[in-house]
Design a protein with these regions (language model features):
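The conserved cystathionine-beta-synthase
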Residues: 12-30, 37, 79-98, 104-105, ...
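A glycine-centered beta-loop-beta connector
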Residues: 26, 34-49, 94, 102-117, ...
Length: 263
């Protein structure tokens, strides 16, 4: 099987466009990434994480998101591959380099392969051994409390390079904050609060104000194939793992599932 059989059409944005329009485009197409172009040519990748990074930068506090250009948050965290690249080679690349794959031919972008495409492949081709369960793919969770400041969560997520943060109250899971939640919260904050007051007012914004409640979770012995089905059905990028006492013991992401594939 070749990558052109599973790749998806990427959504693009010009590097001269604004962060505000990028967020609108991401919301419209339900994506956390955009391909950035320069006069139609591949320039880089814009991610929700880097938008959250830029919107929370103190030196840019006085600027509304409509004045910050896409190019300030663009990265080169991708690898170009040909459409006839073997799927096994592509998955190995993604596991080793922790990047997305851009499918190109004759200098033109044909599509991309993200962890979401690999998850769909795992589901359709039964690529996971039957004996694997949630406990095998979960990672130790990095958490925050609902009363913690949003700026603290942003710093923690960027330092640890994670896209989602389980939120606890009295030791129990009550919510989740994603890089998307951070980006939209920072965007709204900039539009509402004047530049001169942002440095002070941002400290009053806490995670309880922006977190998503009603978190979907699994238990440690849930078959990993069921976790994949759940993530695809609910269109979520991570799932907290609870023990039989309803205590948080881990978190599963798309990439932690991909790491379980063996050929």
């Amino acid at each position: 099987m070749q990558v052109n059989e599973i790749m998806s059409d990427p959504i693009t944005i010009e590097k001269s466009d604004t962060i505000s329009n990028a967020l609108y485009t991401m919301e419209k197409y339900n994506t956390r990434r955009l391909i950035v172009t320069n006069e139609g040519e591949l320039y880089g990748i814009l991610t929700m994480r880097n938008i959250a990074r830029q919107l929370g930068t103190r030196k840019k506090y006085a600027l509304p998101a409509s004045s910050i250009h896409v190019t300030t948050a663009t990265t080169k965290d991708f690898i170009k591959i040909l459409p006839d690249t073997n799927i096994k080679e592509a998955i190995t690349l993604m596991k080793e380099k922790q990047v997305i794959l851009i499918v190109v031919e004759n200098n033109g972008v044909l599509g991309w392969i993200t962890p979401h495409e690999i998850l769909k492949l795992i589901n359709s081709k039964n690529l996971l051994p039957d004996y694997l369960c949630a406990e095998d793919a979960m990672r130790s969770p990095i958490t925050a409390n609902s009363g913690d400041r949003v700026v603290h969560a942003r710093r923690l997520m960027l330092e640890k390079d994670i896209g989602r943060l389980p939120i606890l109250e009295d030791g129990l899971l009550v919510g989740m904050v994603s890089e998307k939640d951070l980006a939209y919260a920072m965007h709204a904050f900039r539009n509402i609060v004047s530049g001169s007051k942002q440095d002070t007012r941002i400290k009053n914004l806490i995670l309880a104000d922006i977190m998503k409640r009603g978190v979907i979770s699994v238990i440690t012995d849930t078959p990993l194939s069921d976790v994949v089905n759940l993530m695809l059905k609910e269109d979520i990028g991570s799932v907290p793992v609870l023990d039989l006492k309803d205590e948080l013991v881990g978190i599963i992401t798309r990439r932690s599932i991909i790491s379980q594939i063996s050929f």
